[in-house]
Amino acid sequence: MVYKVFLSLCIGLALSASAALHAQKAVSGHAPIQVETPARSSGQKHVLQLVTPKLETVRIGIIGLGMRGPGAVERFSKIPGTQIVALCDVLPERVKKTQEILVKAGLPEAAAYSGSEDAWKKLCEREDIDLVYIVTDWKTHAEMGVYAMEHGKHAAIEVPAAMTLEEIWKLIDTSERTRKHCIQLENCVYDFFELTTLNMAHQGVFGEILHAEGAYIHNLEDFWPYYWNNWRLDYNRKHRGDVYATHGMGPACQLLDIHRGDRMKTIVAMDTKAVNGPAYIKNKTGEVVADFQNGDQTTSLIRTEKGKTLLIQHNVMTPRPYSRKYQAVGTDGFADKYPLEMYCLRPAQVDSDIAPDHEKLNAHGPVSEEVKKALMEKYKHPIHRELEETAKKVGGHGGMDYIMDYRLIYCLRNGLPLDMDVYDLAEWCCLAELSRISIENGSAPVAIPDFTRGNWDKVKGYRHAMAE
């Protein structure tokens, strides 16, 4: 009897194990959810490494003079080879106030456009503008960028430049068709730790980079009232997924040479329930919101074509220290920016002139502060060697905004490929829709389009263009 029970139990366990294995194979065999990749129109070509005729003076029109636009005017007034031709905002008083920045800098006032939500179109239609610089709310970014390029202008668009795949493809197709630059104004790729770490990666200090992390973790509770017509909180209320991924994505993708030798292939995302968003609205207005879409925290995991991974987080709702989570994991080393900047390296990866006593280095803890400073000085990026002092004086998120604008103008004046192209824009913005699709399908994997449409491996590694 005991033997029969034992035999029955063994058979049952075997059948259960077989069923579990079969289920696992079935799940692992599921193809990722596919999204459409529109065919490239006949005669249209990619804009990888796009160069355009040199501009001795870059004539600029700026749309949006709220939280960020006036700072851009201030920075451009200090960058050689620029001219602010036109300013635009719905509110006339913002245009008038921003004109004071030009006057204070000893520059002529710009043409003014205001009083209408369509006034920006007149700015784009001017024939004396080379670059339209767009710093408005998210929902208007892509439309303005497309319109600017269609009217013969390069487009520089604040993050995120596009919120849907449809908007992304419109920007790509317009840039390819018009042969105009379309750059997303992602400033975090120019921050000092990030750019130094990128240079270290290029020099092989970390070995092969296998994994990178990024995030936007910033409690915006005190800032919600300052967004015009409550647009930002309203967007989070209506949209699920990582709606603001670019600050984390940009530096991480540059580390992994995305569309410069590798490409993002699949994404899996999940989120928490929404708690603090609806609570904030109830506290401020008394309204009970039962369908607030954006979870307090959203996490996305991405696999690349060459077997590397990215982890991206979004949280603007809970009280946490500010963090962009910048992290690089290599075969021979590690970099981490938050909460404390640190490097962890094999002793062999550190030159003896930096750390003469190798016994004090190991791969289980960070290098000393002294060694870290020496590494950051040794591998300081050439862009920082040129611009760091001025950038910190001018300011703009500690100087990285100035470097971003300077590099944009530098490349346009020298006829060089920009530091970021329209495919970077696409890759860093696509999480807004793709993470939502994954979440709404039980965190299923979603295929990430090849926004270069077959050209992701043509450029060998990410580098900044420099004039000879």
Curated annotation (Swiss-Prot):
GO molecular function: hydrolase activity, acting on glycosyl bonds; nucleotide binding
Matches recorded under Gene3D superfamilies: Dihydrodipicolinate Reductase, domain 2, NAD(P)-binding Rossmann-like Domain
Keywords: Glycosidase, Hydrolase, NAD, Signal
Taxonomy, superkingdom: Bacteria
EC numbers on record: 3.2.1.-
Residues reported to bind NAD(+): M67, R68, D89, W138, K139, T140, H141, E158, V159, N187, Y244
Co-factor binding details: Binds 1 NAD(+) per subunit. The NAD(+) cannot dissociate.
Cofactor(s) annotated in UniProt: NAD(+)
Statement: the UniProt record of this protein carries the keyword Nucleotide-binding: no
InterPro entries: Gfo/Idh/MocA-like_OxRdtase_N (IPR000683), Gfo/Idh/MocA_oxidrdct_glycsds (IPR050463), Glyco_hydro_109_C (IPR049303), NAD(P)-bd_dom_sf (IPR036291)
Top-level EC class as recorded in UniProt: hydrolase
Keyword Signal: yes
Residues that, per the record, bind substrate: Y216, R232, Y244, A245, T246, H247, Y322
Residues annotated as signal peptide: 1-19
Function: Glycosidase.
Family: Belongs to the Gfo/Idh/MocA family. Glycosyl hydrolase 109 subfamily.
Name of the protein this chain belongs to: Glycosyl hydrolase family 109 protein
Organism per entry: Porphyromonas gingivalis (strain ATCC BAA-308 / W83)
